[in-house]
Amino acid sequence: LVPKYSEILPSEVDTSIKLTNSLKLKIPLLSSAMDTVTESKMAIAIAKAGGLGIIHRNLDVKKQVSEVKKVKKLSLLVGAAVGAGPREVKRAQALLKENLDMIVVDTAHGHSKKVFEIISFIKKKKNKKTALCAGNIATPEAAKFLLKAGVDVIKVGIGPGSICTTRLVAGIGVPQLSAILNVRGGIKNRNVKIISDGGIKYSGDLSKAFAAGAD
């Protein structure tokens, strides 16, 4: 990124982001729906800082719902993840009863039939205030696919994470900056938000993600 003329001081910058009409964050950061990252403790901490935590799905349904309730008990924002397998419909039903701020269809490959099906199910069952996010994808075609399914937010990133092995094990992926650029350039609906998922090692990586089109 090349520095350019500016009339804005760092202290004047507004870091808030409006993901949907009902969901606004003070900082544009979500904690990952990974079992080593986000349960209620992390979700509470990041919500207090102005972001949003996504409770991971590697829990039985009752435990995941319990983690969501711990955050909601403090009147804080929280999201939760579901997968695309046959048992995930029950998980989605249970979580949606908790008035989530965001539900995330969290899969390694979001451009698939089963992902479309569970998005369609959630779309019918959720209330208007619950944001619907899905991923992960890395191409404009996949983004259009998720838009057709009816998501509010798209999660971009196949294999960029520091501990992710997708590119090594499956030989599949797109460099993260290219993925963001391609997805943002390939969709006409600017109201749909893009999350850059993975690959943030230094603070400067945030700037690059924003410049490429991430929200």
Residue ranges and their predicted role:
Residues 1-29:
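An N-cap/entry alpha-helix motif that binds or orients negatively charged groups
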Residues 1-2, 15, 31, 53, ...:
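Generic structural hydrophobic/aromatic packing signal, biased to beta-strands
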Residues 37-52, 57-215:
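Alpha/beta enzyme core
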